[in-house]
Amino acid sequence: WASWVIEGSTEKIFFSGDSGYGKHFKDIGESFNGFDIAFIENGQYNEKWADIHMMPNETIQAAIDLKAKVFVPIHWGMFDLSLHKWYEPIESSYSIAQEKGIPIIAPKLGEILTNEVQNKSDLWWRASIEKEENTLKVSAVVE
């Protein structure tokens, strides 16, 4: 698919399209000598779709290969194309990023990011998970 780089006088930003994992991330990271922030696809994955969508561990490896100072997971929690729950990509990637010491920002839908933000650990999506699970419990009791 397609990815692009925005290179300003003081910052470099990487934005990925849908992609399978490969050495191209390391090549790009080396070519641009790393990125201040990398927006990397993180969702709608399945082992059968390895050429077009990365698994969470591959997304984190791509952030490492790109030499990203900060990683922003994108393409998650949207359209249900895969078999995983809507929140699985962010939960998995957040956990792996924390284990590997990769700064991760997961902005709320519509939230504006500024270049001062380095590591935002607001786990806002968990309230939605809890609400969804409680709704399912209530529905099961009512039926």
Label every model-predicted segment:
Residues K12, G20-L109:
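Cap/insert and terminal regions of metallo-dependent hydrolase folds
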